[in-house]
């Protein structure tokens, strides 16, 4: 993994980042951070990579579900402070759709319109979704049906990816650690034979 030019941004999102580390890193170029072996600089590099890694995995792991036609939401409780970053990512990929990521205590809201991002930070997911459902006049039947269909498809996909019989299971677990599964609200089956998504969808 290469150190990005905006590595200070990712460093600032690390759970253990502070002003002193940011000031120290601010005197470095990406190239210097890449090759320097000083203990503190090496730590900064690890912190940047930790945030980049979690952000990369969460983009793949977070499951978005519809609330009517104008809202997508998903459970999200990461280790680092990447909530707004990931919410904006999904908003850009779903322009014109309100994206809500969060958990029982707080949530992040992003909307991309004409290339601009509008953001908000709310309380728990349930309260925020209820407010959106009321404001957008989403019917309970419509929301429940959409949610059920999407939950089923996502679970089928993730189940099909988790196969203990994989030849390189250790590598798979490194890329999909349990901590990240829980951060994205995933529930993976533990004892499935090596089958495809089509097999799961057809009930085989």
Predicted stretch roles:
Residues 1-204:
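Extended, well-ordered protein cores
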